[in-house]
Each structure stands twice: as structure tokens, then as C-alpha cells.
Amino acid sequence: MGLFGMMKFAHTHHLVKRRGLGAPAGYFTPIAVDLWNVMYTLVVKYQRRYPSYDREAITLHCLCRLLKVFTQKSLFPIFVTDRGVNCMEPVVFGAKAILARTTAQCRTDEEASDVDASPPPSPITDSRPSSAFSNMRRRGTSLASGTRGTAGSGAALPSAAPSKPALRLAHLFCIRVLRALGYAYINSGQLEADDACANLYHTNTVAYVYTTDTDLLLMGCDIVLDISACYIPTINCRDILKYFKMSYPQFLALFVRCHTDLHPNNTYASVEDVLRECHWTPPSRSQTRRAIRREHTSSRSTETRPPLPPAAGGTETRVSWTEILTQQIAGGYEDDEDLPLDPRDVTGGHPGPRSSSSEILTPPELVQVPNAQLLEEHRSYVANPRRHVIHDAPESLDWLPDPMTITELVEHRYIKYVISLIGPKERGPWTLLKRLPIYQDIRDENLARSIVTRHITAPDIADRFLEQLRTQAPPPAFYKDVLAKFWDE
């Protein structure tokens, strides 16, 4: 899932940065967690080590480890579920739904040229009460008999591939335990989880998204790949834009071709293929050093950069990317930079030789960052209340030709959908972006114990996990208090 080849490209070109994400004392860093994606990664990692554990036991083992790390690193997770909190909502928005709807409408490329390129309104763009969040079942409501969110009798190990055992992830069980423990969560309803994560990021609700899906980068988010390491590998969207020397609208319009969910049967392009078609070359080390020096010595000027030339009408095609990127590489255009540099970016964001906690350049266990420095960096990070808002996302449509094929129609619709998720709306003098509702149930440890003992029948295993939850997952703070302290103080 995600952008094909982006993860490999990011590692090869050193765009995966090691950051501490340390918050000042008394603060928690809010982070959106794509629950299925994160738990899938952990279960695949640990289920081989514990072959005797059933689905619920291995899921709870991974969840205990996850919650322990969140507590140790002062991270405040907001869990985003797939297919609603009951795991039964049909997904009618997002990349997969756009592809399915478009291919059902159009049988040939000729038909695609006559179809409206607008996707259906999402729960975020529709001003009416949304049905996507209407089927919330509050914590403690009993499930139908036999409903466990499992694959049923078909979950046996496939005989043809013994090296790849069936995934033992009890997603619904995981959600119910988290709700009983009082953690904040998003009921994505009919949205895909990564779309809900992008909404949390661009509404300045969370500072990062914890996922390995690189399509979040296409939606302009900064992602965390793994929080269990001593350092935390992250990929910042702005780092990629600087490296590619392009604006976000260009990035969205160009790399939508790499989105695997939009292009079935291996019809997607890889990141390397797209860059090769554009004759893009990576910056030399001397260019990188000069860029870092300029960032350290330049004042935070707000003067506007000369805009990129508008796309030609009617005849615009992807071939024009070659000329545009060639001129950018040659210095003809400056890369867009509307907001101040993020102090958590690659250079640390602070002028002068002083080290920063943003990117760890020495072994993590040797890094001792004073709390005063953490507080200064935090205040600098949240100084601009609109730092995550992307105002120019609609310009991506200017870089696309009119859709003439099914593939181009799918890409066009998806970009419009992304704009509806992350692009603010003008309402007179106000700029508005609707945030998905956040829920947080009252912590009920008795209910958590009941859920665990009902699904994990071995008393010793259940008691061990319950003790871990009691000691390693203390009651989380109220999400409104955490967000107000992080963003407003």
C-alpha cells in the first residue's frame, strides 16, 4: 500500500530521519495511530515468536508493548480504526472506493472522457449531519453471539504457503480493549483510516501520524515508522518536497501515479520511474551543504517567491514535467516555502552550532537534551497555528490534463478527494477545516478485565497481560486537555 517505491527511495536517499520526538516535561505529543497498520506490523513480527498464542493473546501482547512505549516516550495516541469501531462499516470513501466506483461507471477509456471527474462528497466536506458516524456502539454494548471480528473457520494456516502463517490479528478485540482503557479514538466510519489520520494532521490535532503507509506523504503528512526503537524513524513531507525541489501541488499531481490502491494489476508507476521520466537528478552533497548553510544563516523572511508559470490550457500533458523540473534543478525556479522551517526538520531549525533534539546525530542513549531546550523547540514548533494547513492543494488540478482515460479519471477524482480532506474552506474572513470527532470513553478496568478473560481462556496468560496493562498503561489524560496544552500554551 502507499506510493510504490517511496519507502525504498526514502531510505536510499537518507530521507528517513532519526528523531527523539521528546516533549517538554508535563507535555504529551499527540500522534494519530493507524491502528490496523501498526498492529498488523507488530503481529507479523511477534506471532512467530509465540506460536502457542491464539489471535487475541498475540494481539494483546503487541498492544501491551505498544502502550508501554507510548507512555515511556510521552506520546498521546489517538487511535484511528478501520471500518468503524465495530469493524463492519462499508468503506465508501477513499482510494479503493474511487477506483471501484469509476471502473463500474466506465467500461472503456472513451466513456471516461464524458464522466464527471468529481468524487462524491466526504463526511468532512458535507455540511449535513453525516451517517458515517451514526452507528457508534458505545463501550460495553454486547456483541452478537459468536462475533469476534475473526475470519471464522477459514483462518487456518494455508497449506500451500507454510512460511507465511495466517495473520493472527484480532482487530475488533483490540479496539474494545483500548476503549475500555479510556484511550482516545476516531471512528473512521465509512472513511479509510489513513484519510482520517490526514484530517487529524491537517487540522493541527496531531503532530505526526504513526503508520508505514506512504500514501500519507502524498496527503502532506509527516509519518512515524516505528516508535519502539531508541530513536524514532520519521519521514517529513517537507523534506521530500525540498529534496525534489517542487511544491506540494506538483508533488501530489505527479506522484498520484504511484498510488497502488488507484492502479490495479501492477499498472502503477514507481517513484524512480516517475523521476526518471522527469530527468530528475538528486542534489549533490555540495548543494545539500549550501542549502543547509543558507537555512542556518537566512532570516525568517516572509517575502513571496516568484510563482511557477501557470499550466498551459487544454494541451497540458505530463511531458511538461520534464521542462519544469529541469529548470528547477538548474536554478530557474525556487522551491515554494510558505511557512517557516520546522524546527523538527533535518537541520534542527535553530541557527548556530547548538545541537537540537529534533534529529539525533549521536547514539540515542548518549543524547541528553535539557528541558529548557525542549520547551524552546516546542514553542517554536507551534508558533504558527496553521503550520499543517496546505492552502495551495487545489493548484494540483492545474497540473493535470483533462481526464481522457479511466486511469486519468481515477487520479483526477482522487486528487479532488484529497483536496476535500486537507484543503481549508473560505467562509468570509475565516478559513475553516472540519475535524473528525474524537471519542474517549471513561476508563473501566473491570470491563477491560472482562473482555480479556472472555477471549483469553488461559488464566495465567490473561492475568499476566492484565498486570502489564495495569502497570504499563496508566489512565490516559483527557484528550482536550492534552491538545490544549500542546498547541495553545
From Swiss-Prot:
Result after altering E316K: In strain: Nonneuroinvasive mutant HF10
GO cellular component: virion component
Enzyme class, broadest EC rank: hydrolase
Domain of life per record: Viruses
Region (Disordered): 110-135, 142-161, 285-319, 332-364
E.C. numbers: 3.1.27.-
Entry keyword set: Decay of host mRNAs by virus, Endonuclease, Eukaryotic host gene expression shutoff by virus, Host gene expression shutoff by virus, Host mRNA suppression by virus, Host-virus interaction, Hydrolase, Inhibition of host innate immune response by virus, Interferon antiviral system evasion, Late protein, Nuclease, RNA-binding, Viral immunoevasion, Virion
Biological process (GO), any one: symbiont-mediated suppression of host innate immune response
Classification via Gene3D superfamilies: 5'-nuclease
Ranges of Polar residues composition bias in the record: 124-134
Family per similarity comment: Belongs to the herpesviridae VHS protein family.
Extra remark: Strain 17 is relatively weak regarding early shutoff compared to strain KOS. Strain HSZP protein is non-functional for host protein shutoff.
Record's protein name: Virion host shutoff protein
Species of the source: Human herpesvirus 1 (strain 17) (HHV-1)
